[in-house]
Amino acid sequence: VQTCALPIFNLPYGGGKGGIVCDPRQMSIHEVERLSRGYVRAISQFVGPNKDIPAPDVFTNSQIMAWMMDEYSALDKFNSPGFITGKPIVLGGSHGRDRSTALGVVIAIEQAAKRRNMQIEGAKVVIQGFGNAGSFLAKFLYDLGAKIVGISDAYGALHDPNGLDIDYLLDRRDSFGTVTNLFEETISNKELFELDCDILVPAAISNQITEDNAHDIKASIVVEAANGPTTPEATRILTERGILLVPDVLASAGGVTVSYFEWVQNNQGYYWSEEEVNEKLREKLEAAFDTIYELSQNRKIDMRLAAYIIGIKRTAEAARYRGWA
């Protein structure tokens, strides 16, 4: 998927996914460190600054990236900050990387709202997931004047039709994004997706919007902050209902885009300010949104299909120039 998605933004990356089957919430910090270093030793021959470049995702953070960079540098016998992204600033990380996924989603929401003549201020928003992306996203939108009427984590969901106090929730959440277990009155994830709202953002895990609940969604805009949260059948249903669905390959690309920026900065040995990073990110995402939305309107197809058409076309063009086809 990433191989086809990244050409949408003209990023010279391929793509791949990997992970470890574990629950870091049940592990000590020392166990997480040993596991992180062991993972790097296992994949070290396949990764590197000029091979595959790992980046953070679910249940990872800058500390884990730092351990991994340190382990790879020990194996490589050379300080290799460009081996991995999402690092702390002091180890060659990029300004803005920690909130880049959320900022990318905000940019996608702004562009989608503009197409639907919707104001962010006062809009009712539901966010599934309150981890790194979900919590930063909630804070961004809250500060823009949106009403966050529902959020969820792994243990349940919270709802307030008048808008939740996001600053209070952020102050109470733990390092894994858990907050609902502190409240007696919660709702289920099923009920979360049925809430009356203008914008729905699945920012947790895959396959959350299916043909079983797609008809219950009341939002007019759905923006995918998670990877693959909507099934193909649900995508068809939402599109037929006139709901604007902004696909994950576009909406959740803020993180990987700034990971690319981090890699570029590591290679150059020259680092940008957070304002520069955010400006470059906005430029990339707004251009990609315009291209995808225009194609979807011209061909009367959903934005996911339009995004894949663009990504696959650019990938195929590169392959032809290299003599692969």
Regions found by a protein language model. Give the residues of each.
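Rossmann-like adenosine-cofactor binding region
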Residues: 156-245, 250
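Adenosine-phosphate binding glycine-rich loop
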Residues: 112-113, 216-325
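General beta-strand structural signal in soluble alpha/beta enzymes
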Residues: 51-55, 78-84, 150-153, 201-202, ...
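Glycine/serine-rich phosphate-binding loop and adjoining beta1-alpha1 elements at the start
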Residues: 7-120
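Conserved active-site and cofactor/substrate-binding residues in soluble primary-metabolism enzymes
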Residues: 27-38, 59-63, 67, 96, ...
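Short, small-residue-biased leader/transition segments that mark boundaries at the very start
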Residues: 1-6
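Glycine-rich phosphate/diphosphate-binding loop of Rossmann-like nucleotide-binding domains
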Residues: 87, 93-194
